[in-house]
Amino acid sequence: MILAASMVLGVSGCGKSQKSTQDSGNTAKVKIAYQYGLAYAPLTIMQEQGLIEKNYDGDIEVEWVSLNSGSAINEGMASGDIDVACMGIAPFISGVTAGIPYKMYGTIAAQPHELLTNDDSIHSLKDITDDKKISVVNIGSIQHILLAMLAKEELGDAHALDNNLVAMSHPDGMTALMSGSVACQLTTAPYIFKAKEQDNIKEAESLDSVWPEGNAFIVGLVSDDLYENQPEVYQAVVDATQEAMDYINNNQEEAANILCKKEDVSAETMLGWMQDPGCVYDMKLPGVMDMANFMAENDFADKAPESFEAITTESAR
């Protein structure tokens, strides 16, 4: 099952023609797409503290757009509507190997992932029968690929559970899990923390054997157009991302006071989530090529990237 997007056909003719604005005195513009969840904390800090504006030497307008899936972000990047984006590794690999003109400028976060269940009879993937549904955020999402990795290891076939999958947003999947509409959900923070507050929800099986704690989850992307034609804007985004991560890592209580508003929880609860050992914010986390190679070998992508350098900018290396 190849997940490469047909949207990239003819993509070389798409996009905005941009030139450096710093020398001309014009106002630069950058449009940034992101999703939701604890993994996007650096983006929240960047937005709240105006860090791109701070790191750009000139006038710049930053537009923030929240989208609900990696496929939607890929469509925006392919059309040239989006300049910078953050999303899971898997849709990035699908997009970049299909020809979407962008590169990874760094990893954003690692987050804990768990396969949760409400069914006491499920202790491993071998216990999941054909009638048991598993919610993942999207087909081709990193959660889908992590489940496929576990299926390959335990069942011998990365696609063994494809017919069990239903695509739901993380919040909707959590609601379905708690109500019994699905038997399992493979999800991430903070939804694993919220779901496990319920007495009937437990972890079905660990993912550590296929995706160790600290491996990358969310990556930051920049369009080739912006990277090549507006290097000052690109550098401001990179510097702002690093500054946001430094702020989170060095000022956790202050960061929790900002981030708690996004999830509508107390600062104390947010701080507890952030201090989970699986919650890491760093621009050079491992795992990107491991996932790329797995996806190519198991028909989730049409090919693997030629090299890590071929799909990244210097700030990611």
PLM feature segments, named:
Residues 26-31, 54-66, 81, 154-168, ...:
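A local structural motif
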Residues 296-317:
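Conserved C-terminal helix/tail region of periplasmic/extracytoplasmic solute-binding proteins
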Residues 90-91, 159-162, 166, 170-258:
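Pocket-lining segment of extracytoplasmic ligand-binding domains
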Residues 29, 36-66, 72, 78, ...:
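Short, polar/charged alpha-helical segment
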Residues 29-51, 114, 118-194:
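Bilobed "Venus flytrap"/periplasmic-binding protein-like clamshell domains
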Residues 25, 94-105, 152, 194-208:
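Ligand-binding "clamshell"
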Residues 1-29, 317:
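Short, low-complexity disordered leader/linker segments with a strong preference
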Residues 228-300:
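Secondary-structure end/capping motifs
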